[in-house]
Amino acid sequence: MNTKKTLLATVAALTFAGYSVAGMANDGGLAFGRSQAPAPLEGTWVVTIQPIVCSSGIDVPGVPSVRAYLTFAPGGTMTETNSNMAFEPGQRGPGHGYWERTGRTSYQFALEAFIQFDSKLAPFRYKRGYQRLDQTVEMHTTDDWTSSGRVQFFAGTSTTDPSPSGCARSTGARMF
């Protein structure tokens, strides 16, 4: 009889422990980092990017906002394309990067895009090289978010000498 009680208690304890470990691993779908768990950020977003003055956060005078599409894929990869009229046709390629969850409704992402050739038309803004965006994202609902962060331009293959760089504030709306 004692053996049956001990065996029953052991099975009950192992069953409870198994469910507890599974519950902790799932964490209600709130996995962090570049995990495989689904995240509300996944999907394609219509994004409005506004260049801002880094020190004050005010819009850069005379610089219009840019419309972009950002796609956040499962596993932490992303792609981007935009309509920035400051680039000449074919001058900037699509952006590729990564994203990760940093909090319950917070994320960060980084992407880079090649600048294929120096600007040929005045005001000769961009040199051949690449553009990098580093942004922090705060989701407000499952269908909208805001972000802010750095936008850097690097000439050639340099990683230490950014050409005209700045900051940007963005709003994202899920594409339906």
Regions found by a protein language model. Name each.
Residues 29-30, 151-176:
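Edge beta-strand at a domain terminus
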Residues 20-25, 31-33:
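Boundary at the C-terminal end of the N-terminal hydrophobic targeting segment
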Residues 59-106, 113-117, 144, 155:
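N-terminal glycine/threonine-rich, aromatic-flanked beta-hairpin/loop signature
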Residues 67-72, 95-100, 128-143, 149-151, ...:
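Hydrophobic/aromatic beta-strand elements that line small-molecule binding cavities or substrate pockets
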Residues 1-9:
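Bacterial N-terminal signal peptides that target proteins for export
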Residues 37-59, 95-97:
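Tryptophan-anchored aromatic micro-motifs
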Residues 10-19:
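Bacterial N-terminal signal peptides
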Residues 62, 91, 124-132, 165-171:
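Amphipathic hydrophobic-ligand
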